[in-house]
């Protein structure tokens, strides 16, 4: 969603409510809504506006304060937020976090931690108090750091948060001065972060030195920047529409089809890969890493990549994503084997007992047995011939990296009875019997 930036915009409750209606035509009633409250002027004003709008419309917002512990005054800020929320009659949740740089600057690390907490809280709508001047600064920072289209498009008014929520920035149409004027008019208190004047931080250098000089030299400089941001956001939105359509075609059969992906131009292939990773919850790697993935998909029949807690596998013309723990021994088999009543231990560990033309007799599942992973010596009768279970898995075209951890059902003497999701031993199978099926071990071909 794009906002129009107008120099004559004045921040009033009516103007704010119009922004709310533009974004949420059905209103916020029934939505779990919160403001990220730092105690600074911008978030103080935003919470006041949302509380006033809520009184008119019949919804009650909450507030969320992230205690980073980076300032010696951090406890004072938390106290201020609690007192301010008490004054407004809204609930406040304060979350203490430990900021670790992990190769990032302190600002970026704090922001990363903050947004991670935002995503975990399960809000339908989380309102952030970024305004028009913040947007200009964000664009200029992206220019200075060599950002691409996504960085130069700066901050969207609305973007996804977690699984089902959204981040909403309703103050983007308004300037820092508009917010000051509103606060003075309503007598709102606030605290000042001492780091906001520290020009050792690049954003503050832009705010206090570079942007004032550019604005003095170039008439309507801020307006020009915002026009650029709006145009770039439109280009980005169009690009994302095209990429989504491309991905739907590449993954149209329910999986990432490498042959289909190869029909695209190099640029579109890169964007499809990036979108595929993002849709699967994988942090998108840098351009060089994406290029390496694309090269292997193009030139080799197989490939494997470790990506921050995930594994990407290229096999048989398809690209697969697994959480790293999925490729370790199943959690329910971490101690090696599970013994007991077969029906009980299978259902307790998320197996579905499905009807199968050649499945296990139901009476057999009422007996004691063993649940474990396959062993090199395991065999099952298939069509009257005993086959090694790993050959059976290979014949089913189970992914090679899943074969060593595949679940097997055995009797109390450890004789294999059935290979999960695949087949039961033919010599003991019955018509319309039972085959144990686990959702984490799909037969993909």
Curated annotation (Swiss-Prot):
- EC class, as a word, reads ligase
Spell out the InterPro entries in the cross-references: Lysidine-tRNA-synth_C, Rossmann-like_a/b/a_fold, TilS/TtcA_N, tRNA_Ile_lys_synt, tRNA_Ile_lys_synt_N, tRNA_Ile_lys_synt_subst-bd
Which positions form S-S bridges? Answer: none
Please write the reaction equations for the catalytic activity of this protein.
Answer: cytidine(34) in tRNA(Ile2) + L-lysine + ATP = lysidine(34) in tRNA(Ile2) + AMP + diphosphate + H(+)
- Provide GO CC annotations from the record: cytoplasm
Identify the main location.
cytoplasm
Q: Which compartments does it reside in?
A: Cytoplasm
E.C. number(s) listed in UniProt: 6.3.4.19
Positions with a binding annotation for ATP:
38-43
A Gene Ontology biological process in which this protein takes part is:
tRNA modification
- Which superkingdom, per the lineage? Bacteria
Keyword Ligase set for record: yes
Q: Which UniProt keywords apply?
A: ATP-binding, Cytoplasm, Ligase, Nucleotide-binding, tRNA processing
Any one Gene Ontology molecular-function term assigned to this protein's record:
tRNA(Ile)-lysidine synthase activity
Family, per the entry?
Belongs to the tRNA(Ile)-lysidine synthase family.
The free-text domain remark for this protein reads: The N-terminal region contains the highly conserved SGGXDS motif, predicted to be a P-loop motif involved in ATP binding.
Name of the protein described by the UniProt record: tRNA(Ile)-lysidine synthase
Species name: Neisseria gonorrhoeae (strain ATCC 700825 / FA 1090)
- In the UniProt record, the gene name given for this protein reads tilS
């Amino acid at each position: 969603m794009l906002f129009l930036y107008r120099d004559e915009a004045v921040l009033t409750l009516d103007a704010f409510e119009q922004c709310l209606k533009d974004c949420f035509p059905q209103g916020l009633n029934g939505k779990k809504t919160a403001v990220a409250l730092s105690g600074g002027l911008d978030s103080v004003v935003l919470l006041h506006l949302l509380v006033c709008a809520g009184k008119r419309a019949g919804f009650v917002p909450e507030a969320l304060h992230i205690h980073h512990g980076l300032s010696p005054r951090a406890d004072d800020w938390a106290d201020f937020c609690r007192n301010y929320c008490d004054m407004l009659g809204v609930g406040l949740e304060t979350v203490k976090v430990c900021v670790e740089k992990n190769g990032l600057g302190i600002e970026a690390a704090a922001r990363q931690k903050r947004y991670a907490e935002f995503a975990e809280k399960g809000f339908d709508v989380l309102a952030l108090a970024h305004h028009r001047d913040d947007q200009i600064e964000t664009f200029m920072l992206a220019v200075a750091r060599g950002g691409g289209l996504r960085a130069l498009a700066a901050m969207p008014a609305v973007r996804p948060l977690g699984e089902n929520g959204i981040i909403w920035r309703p103050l983007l149409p308004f300037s820092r001065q508009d917010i000051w004027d509103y606060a003075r008019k309503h007598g709102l208190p606030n605290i000042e972060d001492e780091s906001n004047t520290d020009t050792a931080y690049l954003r503050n250098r832009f705010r206090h030195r570079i942007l004032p000089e550019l604005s003095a030299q170039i008439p309507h400089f801020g307006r020009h920047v915002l026009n650029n941001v709006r145009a770039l956001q439109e280009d980005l939105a169009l690009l994302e529409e095209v990429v989504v359509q491309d991905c739907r075609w590449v993954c149209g059969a329910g999986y990432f089809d490498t042959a289909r992906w190869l029909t695209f131009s190099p640029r579109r292939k890169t964007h499809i890969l990036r979108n595929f990773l993002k849709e699967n919850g994988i942090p998108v790697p840098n351009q060089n890493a994406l290029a390496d993935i694309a090269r292997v998909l193009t030139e080799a029949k197989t490939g494997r990549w470790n990506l921050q807690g995930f594994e990407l596998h290229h096999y048989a013309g398809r690209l697969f994503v697994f959480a790293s723990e999925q490729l370790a021994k199943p959690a329910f088999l971490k101690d090696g084997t599970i013994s007991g009543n077969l029906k009980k231990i299978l259902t307790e560990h998320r197996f579905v007992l499905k009807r199968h033309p050649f499945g296990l007799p139901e009476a057999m599942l009422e007996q004691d047995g063993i649940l474990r992973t396959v062993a090199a010596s395991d065999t099952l009768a298939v069509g009257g011939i005993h086959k090694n279970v790993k050959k059976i898995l290979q014949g089913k075209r189970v992914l090679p990296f899943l074969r060593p951890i595949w679940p097997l059902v055995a009797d109390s003497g450890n004789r294999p009875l059935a290979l999960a999701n695949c087949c039961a031993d033919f010599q003991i199978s019955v018509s319309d019997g039972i085959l144990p099926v686990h959702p984490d071990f799909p037969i993909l071909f």
